[in-house]
């Protein structure tokens, strides 16, 4: 029986415009409910047997919602939720979810006006230190231009895994008109990859291209360049596949996203390295239990 293949990054929501202000003009495909019954046939078609559900908005009710879904659905292997890490009663708040599939936390750092000041805040730093001391993962969500702002933060918090979402969001939409964009992102990525406790999700790249005009052949080449750069920086044992469904639907179908990474991996990685990319690294970092049966 083969190892369980895992989609390390996807979202669920019951859509209300007030809850998801980031779903704006031109994003109508996202302005509807997305729940497990819609995802799991797509996963099955790609031989993916489990997923990690990641928060898509701030609020403790978001965490509770995802954990409720995970309780009823075996294929949701883990939840990356949201919590106010600056709260003085953080330990008590997180204790409410003990015994669940909660494995980590995330905040949309990319939306903060001053990312460096946010992560340098003493209360936030105390919260992240507590998470790591208690074996919770922290997912880091920033744009390429913000990577230098989290370098020192990531270096300081080295007691447990940090996961860089979407490969640090390279500015793919700029690659054709800015010869420095790829090199700038790659240099910042290598700085983070030098920290052995930082791992990287190969996720969310299709929507960093100019998805409003549709993906072009040049976009696919640039995405492959980014995949190569991430492999060069992190090595094959610190990469994990994530679909970023349903956000990926702005640019490509679930099958297209998974197939793009599959083709790339087949041409670059050994069988053991592909096993790490497609589940082994996610299982290790998020401390997922060994499945009794990896059947879909």
UniProtKB/Swiss-Prot annotation:
Q: What class of enzyme is it?
A: hydrolase
- Which terms under GO biological process does the entry name? fucose catabolic process
Q: Which UniProt keywords apply?
A: Carbohydrate metabolism, Fucose metabolism, Hydrolase
Under the heading Pfam families, the entry gives: Amidohydro_2
Pathway(s) where this gene product acts: Carbohydrate degradation; L-fucose degradation
Note the SUPFAM superfamilies from the entry.
Metallo-dependent hydrolases (SSF51556)
Q: What is its EC number?
A: 3.1.1.120
Q: Which InterPro entries match?
A: Amidohydro-rel, Metal_Hydrolase, Metallo-dep_Lactonases
Molecular-function GO term, any one: hydrolase activity
Protein purpose? L-fucono-1,5-lactonase involved in an L-fucose degradation pathway. Catalyzes the hydrolysis of L-fucono-1,5-lactone to L-fuconate. L-fucono-1,5-lactone is the best substrate, but the enzyme can also hydrolyze L-fucono-1,4-lactone, L-galactono-1,4-lactone D-arabinono-1,4-lactone and L-xylono-1,4-lactone.
Subunit text: Monomer.
Recorded family membership: Belongs to the metallo-dependent hydrolases superfamily.
Query: What else does UniProt say about it?
Result: It was not possible to determine the kinetic constants for the hydrolysis of L-fucono-1,5-lactone because of chemical instability, and thus, a stable mimic (4-deoxy-L-fucono-1,5-lactone) was utilized.
Recorded protein name is: L-fucono-1,5-lactonase
